[in-house]
Swiss-Prot record:
It comes from the Eukaryota. Counter-exchange transport activity is saturable and inhibited by pyridoxal-5'-phosphate, EDTA and EGTA. Activated by calcium Ca(2+) and manganese Mn(2+) ions, and slightly by iron Fe(2+) and zinc Zn(2+) ions. Repressed by copper ions Cu(2+) and slightly by magnesium Mg(2+) ions. Magnesium Mg(2+) ions promotes slightly ATP uptake, ATP-Mg(2+) being exchanged with ATP(4-). This is Calcium-dependent mitochondrial ATP-magnesium/phosphate carrier protein 2. Residues 230-263, 325-363, 424-457 are mitochondrial matrix. Residues 1-211, 284-310, 384-405, 478-487 are mitochondrial intermembrane. Ca(2+) 1 binds at residues 85, 87, 89, 91, 96. Residues 36-71, 72-107, 108-138, 139-174 form the EF-hand domain. SMART domains: EFh. It comes from Arabidopsis thaliana. It is found in: Mitochondrion inner membrane. The gene is APC2.
Amino acid sequence: MEATKSSKQNCCNPVKKPGPVSIDHVLLALRETREERDLRIRSLFSFFDSENVGYLDCAQIEKGLCALQIPSGYKYAKELFRVCDANRDGRVDYHEFRRYMDDKELELYRIFQAIDVEHNGCISPEGLWDSLVKAGIEIKDEELARFVEHVDKDNDGIIMFEEWRDFLLLYPHEATIENIYHHWERVCLVDIGEQAVIPEGISKHIKRSNYFIAGGIAGAASRTATAPLDRLKVLLQIQKTDARIREAIKLIWKQGGVRGFFRGNGLNIVKVAPESAIKFYAYELFKNAIGENMGEDKADIGTTVRLFAGGMAGAVAQASIYPLDLVKTRLQTYTSQAGVAVPRLGTLTKDILVHEGPRAFYKGLFPSLLGIIPYAGIDLAAYETLKDLSRTYILQDAEPGPLVQLGCGTISGALGATCVYPLQVVRTRMQAERARTSMSGVFRRTISEEGYRALYKGLLPNLLKVVPAASITYMVYEAMKKSLELD
């Protein structure tokens, strides 16, 4: 601490705290003349206006952000364009661009001063930490060090206003300490390619619970929308005869009408929040434990280790909520006879406990866990390959936008699910049967009595779920993030 304070006193250029902030204060902090600033802004405009047309459109801004290697350029381009285009004529001329630069630099200087409470003309790690804590953001020492290191371009341990400005100049949102931290978190921590198993970026933020709310609502919406396909898939998986989709649909309708297609969906929704929470926290614990064992920071562990940590976290989450999954399957596969109503959840759960014992709630758990690592590995490898192909052949080396990433994730997820689908069929059959059976026994009996094709019963409705589920989850999640002010 003392070393940092000494460094701060030696390296910072003290600046008196002014009253109302003006461009003159910005020039003083940057040690820049008006002419030099004009030239700098004009040069930046020309950089974006690479075709010398005299104005900027959204495509030019997006191209410029990609050239500057700014992550999320596809998204910020639209938002930056909207903020700059003051007269809403669909183009940004130099005067509009200049007005944005003036407003943004003044805004950044104000918050720079708010963090620099000692008015030394620089931000120290301690000052930044104090501001984050006051904003309700928990941050570990190593995260703070990475934050400072990312912004501190000359590596002197402190952040000058020029470095602060460069980091945030093209950030189109209001520069509050919460937004700035969230921006850094996304820029530096989120890597969709390496997070195919569990996405990161929720670290120790004050609004962490809101991410779970957004994810929970998105998951509930997508599961409800695809519930009929899920019920159809489960019924086809347990069929001993040739599984025909039309007959299965008729059976569902006969037994429950429209509501029959949504049987078990309530439990499916209930699983979302605890499964996501357990998976996230287990992932963080496994990353920390593996990083400590390898003598590395958890942020520096490689893709393979992340894949393993994600798989282990998925296994823990799956095992924790597995009884709910088994009861859901029993509800979905229950056949009403002679007008007998489907039993209530409590009655069905009690019946399983009394007649089959507590172990029955974990029937099929082993094949379920067995498929996690292969699925994650195939999903990750396919995702990375598809993203690279899209970058090379479709986007001309630009970074994939959210829709391209969604498409890559959808295809890779479908491929991974198909490869481990036989394990899913075996799991469902073990869950649905009252008799105690082993995984190998179900495999052998299925193949000998029905052939290898039986291991893929219900695959079509399972694949048909993928696109709408991914699309609905993405759209609802993005909408919820805006509603909860997470963006």
